[in-house]
Swiss-Prot record:
InterPro entries found in the cross-reference section: AAA+_ATPase, ATP-synt_VA_C, ATP_synth_F1_bsu, ATPase_a/bsu_AS, ATPase_alpha/beta_chains, ATPase_F1/V1/A1_a/bsu_N, ATPase_F1/V1/A1_a/bsu_N_sf, ATPase_F1/V1/A1_a/bsu_nucl-bd
One Gene Ontology cellular component annotation held by this UniProt entry: proton-transporting ATP synthase complex
Protein name: ATP synthase subunit beta
Gene that encodes the chain: atpD
Enzyme class: translocase
Keyword vocabulary terms for this entry: ATP synthesis, ATP-binding, Cell membrane, CF(1), Hydrogen ion transport, Ion transport, Membrane, Nucleotide-binding, Translocase, Transport
Stored Gene3D superfamilies: 2.40.10.170, Bovine Mitochondrial F1-atpase, Atp Synthase Beta Chain, Chain D, domain 3, P-loop containing nucleotide triphosphate hydrolases
Reaction equation(s) it catalyzes: ATP + H2O + 4 H(+)(in) = ADP + phosphate + 5 H(+)(out)
PANTHER family: ATP SYNTHASE, ATP SYNTHASE SUBUNIT BETA, MITOCHONDRIAL
Organism: Lactobacillus acidophilus (strain ATCC 700396 / NCK56 / N2 / NCFM)
Subcellular location per the Swiss-Prot or TrEMBL entry: Cell membrane
An annotated Gene Ontology molecular function: ATP binding
HAMAP family referenced in this protein's UniProt entry, alphabetically: ATP_synth_beta_bact
Topology in membrane: Peripheral membrane protein
Length: 479
């Protein structure tokens, strides 16, 4: 095992010189700097500068490192523990437990975090819908089991809340194995999620990996690969269907951008690293379904300054089967989840996949919301009185549809005091069909806000002193 020494430290980037007559460590190999008997720092080889000098990225803080310190080559990339024993545990980028639990023995199976994507002939595709219990998602941008989903939105519009709700709903209903990867997000949110999952009994089926905001960029760059390696083991070796949650994929790009200039690369568009597309491709191509098992990936994507043309979110778009776009204007109206029903999309919204009735109701919902969107300019200038009776009816139904797309979340119950609701797809379709067919025209708009199935609307309206006159709505209420 070759040994070198530190010749330069620039923030998270460390240059290490090895003797030229010995074999140099390979790119992506892990190096270990021995600070003291019980303390060491892991570096990852990124570039060869010539004359035996390697440029590396530190996975931990470089405080206390100095020139001349000894560095040893581990002879392999960073490796992390895998298998059933990782469930219910919390790890850092190096696969070290950070939950206060026991460390893994040295002979425990481990896998390197750098791997090739599965071969083309091993891939498989599924057209099975993954029910989430969230009305706006299930109706307008259904998620595919074994597919990739992106939750796009600016700061503070509810990406993490939706991810947490999806973990709550899918992990409890689907009951499979989940891997949660926190990439460069708030430690508080990770802490809340850990205790929530522990309380709800979901933690025993979940492995968690964190490289949060306070970590050096090296850890934030590689932690997504650590989480993915755990998920790949469950898929390839145990043949499981795995859910992989990544919050937030933008921070993966941002960390790469932070170290890119220090590595000596010329910045590309908007100051991002020139290798942005390659890095994103290497990660996303590994998140896929094979003949052995599947990985369903749900990724939160921060949109800087709400600009969807920014290279980081736009590079991610290319890999996704469904996109859920969160809109700040809906947050301002108090509509949660603030999903834009016209901008969000899914490749699965097809009559051959979701069925004819689902497809027709979804397109009618989009049509009525689009028409309302077009009429808003007239309403803001001339008022409602200038609309025809037919247009007034469209506006009234569209507003009810818009409010009915909102929903109370289980994970937000501690803040709102209102219990959450899980709505099956059949119930969602039935509810929107009743609104669009005019069966609930005489109910007040407020009855549709923040409710679960359509029965909740009827109960809420009754509490407001309004009973529907429509026979179909009455029959539902009596049930």
């Amino acid at each position: 095992m070759s040994e070198g020494e530190i010749v330069q430290v620039i923030g998270p980037v460390v240059d290490v010189k090895f003797p030229i007559d010995k074999n140099l460590p390979d790119i992506n190999n892990a190096l270990r700097v021995i600070k003291s008997e019980d303390e060491s720092i892991v570096l990852e080889v990124t570039l060869e500068l010539g004359d035996g000098v390697l440029r590396t990225i530190a996975m931990e803080s470089t405080d206390g490192l100095r020139r001349g310190m000894k560095v040893e080559d581990t002879g392999a990339p960073i490796s992390v523990p895998v298998g059933e024993d990782t469930l219910g545990r919390v790890f850092n980028v190096l696969g070290q437990p950070i939950d206060g639990g026991p460390a893994f023995p040295k002979d425990h199976p481990r896998e390197g975090i750098h791997k090739e994507a599965p071969k083309y002939e091993d891939l498989t595709t599924s057209r099975e819908i993954l029910e989430t219990g969230i009305k706006v998602i299930d109706l307008l941008e259904p998620y595919v089991r074994g597919g990739k989903v992106g939750l796009f939105g600016g700061a503070g519009v509810g990406k993490t809340t939706i991810i947490q709700e999806l973990i709550h709903n899918i992990a409890q209903e689907h009951g499979g194995i989940s891997v949660f990867t926190g990439v460069g997000e708030r430690t508080r949110e990770g802490n809340d999620l850990y205790f929530e999952m522990k309380a709800s009994g979901v933690l025993s089926k979940t492995a968690m990996v964190f490289g949060q905001m306070n970590e050096p960029p090296g850890a934030r760059m590689r932690v997504a690969l650590t989480g993915l390696t755990l998920a790949e083991y469950f898929r390839d070796v145990e043949g499981q269907d795995v859910l992989l949650f990544i919050d937030n994929i933008f921070r993966f790009t941002q960390a790469g951008s932070e170290v890119s200039a220090l590595l000596g690369r010329m910045p590309s568009a908007v100051g991002y690293q020139p290798t942005l597309a390659t890095e994103m491709g290497q990660l996303q191509e590994r998140i896929t379904s094979t003949k052995k098992g599947s990985i369903t990936s749900i990724q939160a994507v921060y949109v800087p300054a709400d600009d969807y043309t920014d290279p980081a979110p736009s590079t991610t778009f290319a890999y996704l089967d469904a996109t859920t776009n969160l809109e700040r204007s809906l947050v301002e109206q108090g509509i949660y989840p603030a999903v834009d029903p016209l901008e969000s999309s899914s490749s699965a919204l097809d009559p051959e996949v979701v069925g004819q009735e689902h497809y027709e109701v979804a397109t009618r919902v989009q049509h009525v919301l689009q028409r309302y969107h077009e009429l808003q300019d007239i309403i803001s200038v001339l008022g409602m009185d200038e609309l025809s009776d037919e247009e007034k009816l469209i506006v009234a139904r569209a507003r009810k549809v818009q409010f009915f797309l909102s929903q109370n979340f289980f994970v937000a119950e501690q803040f709102t005091g209102v219990p959450g609701s899980y709505v099956p797809i059949k119930e969602t379709i039935k509810g929107f069909k009743l609104i669009l067919d005019g069966h609930l025209d005489d109910l007040p708009e407020d009855a549709f806000r923040g409710v679960g199935p359509i029965e909740d609307v009827l109960k809420k309206a009754q509490e407001m002193g309004v009973t529907p006159s429509d026979p179909e709505a009455k029959a539902l209420l009596e049930k």
